[in-house]
Regions:
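N-terminal glycine-/serine-/threonine-rich phosphate-binding loop
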Residues: 1-36
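Short, active-site-adjacent cap segments at secondary-structure transitions
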Residues: 12-14, 42-45, 113-114, 166-168, ...
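Glycine/small-residue-rich interface belts in oligomeric ring/scaffold proteins
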Residues: 32-48
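Ligand-binding beta-strand-loop-alpha-helix segment within the catalytic cores
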Residues: 48-145, 149-152, 176
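Polyanion-binding loop/helix "lid" in catalytic or ligand-binding cores
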Residues: 137-138, 142-147, 172-204
Length: 204
């Protein structure tokens, strides 16, 4: 049973033809049971801009940005006709009883990724080791958070969909150095079976 995690870049929040682009991508992707998360886009960038002028406490800022991802989740939920997961128990049910192949389910990030002080139900598949894989600062973005989800569900592959072009021969370390993926990504990606980083093609 192939399981795939997809990360949609936050820049797609303002992409007018996102739905048709995703449909074309799905038509060419190998069949799999799919979970997806969405990045923070301009919401997170605004916090970066504030931090550049008035330095903020790293860990607090990290979790503040994670909280903002609930808003980008709601926006994408409104745009896309995808089922959603918003509670730990729903995620665990998906793992045990995934929907039909090809169906993409949108996951709210704080379903599986929370600060150490936040309560998570005892039946959760997530443990402290998962959180330790990611630094709680700007080195971690939704690229690495998607990788954490892929690691947690033992996904067959992780697909990072970007709006920018991807150098075909670049290593993960080189992609991190150029800012295409975050700095934590090369480390956590070592925990995964397969990783693909792709540009979501423009229609036409």
């Amino acid at each position: 049973m192939m399981k795939r995690v997809i990360k949609l870049g936050g820049s797609f929040l303002t992409c007018p033809d996102l739905e048709s682009r995703l449909q074309r991508w799905q038509e060419t992707a190998p069949p799999a049971h799919c979970l997806a998360i969405v990045g923070g886009g301009g919401l997170i960038n605004s916090i970066r801009e504030i931090d550049a002028v008035v330095p903020l406490e790293e860990q607090t800022t990290h979790w503040r940005c994670v909280e903002l991802l609930s808003h980008t989740f709601e926006i994408m939920k409104q745009r896309l006709d995808w089922p959603t997961i918003e509670r730990v128990v729903e995620l665990e049910h998906w793992i045990q009883n995934p929907p039909p192949l090809g169906k993409i389910t949108l996951v709210r990030v704080d379903t599986f990724y929370r600060s150490s002080g936040s309560p998570v139900c005892e039946s959760s598949i997530w443990n402290s080791h998962g959180s330790e894989l990611l630094p709680e600062n700007w080195k971690t973005t939704t690229d690495s958070i998607a990788a954490l989800l892929a690691w947690g569900i033992h996904a067959s592959e992780l697909v990072i969909l970007k709006s920018c072009s991807i150098p075909p021969e670049a290593s993960l370390a080189q992609l991190a150095e150029s800012g295409i993926v975050d700095q934590a990504f090369p480390h956590i990606a070592k925990e995964l079976q397969n990783v693909r980083i792709e540009q979501l093609a423009v229609d036409g």
